Amino acid sequence: FGLMITMEEGDQSTDPRGIGNFASGVPLGESGLSSRRAPYSTDFSINDYTYGDSNNTAQITQPHGVGFVFATMLWDLTWAYVDKYGFDSDLFNGNGGNNKVMQLVLDGLKLQPCSPGFIDGRDAILAADMASTGGQNQCLIWEVFANRGLGYNASQGDSGDRTDQVEDYNLPPEEDPSLENCEVLSLENILNLASVYPNPSNGFVSISSEYINGQTTVQLID
């Protein structure tokens, strides 16, 4: 949540973000290794930690080390939402991907059981999306978690056991009914579908697209 509420316009998903940098004397706004094993980043050359690493008791301590691995996944999820819905600097009233994912994670916390494991946390977030959108982001959420080893066939074993996690990179089968309402278009995809010009408008606008043939209906909302 600390990373989410300190995001700024222009930040990139691959930027290295540290936690508690001040404790190491790192100036505000600059990245450092901080108090985690690696900075948070979607770039695997910066942060390549996956679910299986949570078994490594020599390097991944508890509670912060284990939480770091799950937070790495949530940071990837944050940027997946920003890619799809855009960024909104208004934390309280905004409707960007950063706003949506923060609410999603909060809703997931309300749904997960006591003493949760990684699978419990993942499934609670999926359930929160199903409850709030009917499952529009199920595919996106699965792709993010599977990319870090928390895939469809992953196992958390006993949530109280540090070394029985099994990672997996598979997605649910396409015929899984929970995926039927998936929306897979990102903001970039949408922008590539059509262009509206001129901007600013002189009272008239033109809409151009290479992907729409024949008649269609367009609704413009200001």
Model-derived features: positions:
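C-terminal outer-membrane/trafficking sorting elements
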Residues: E188-D222
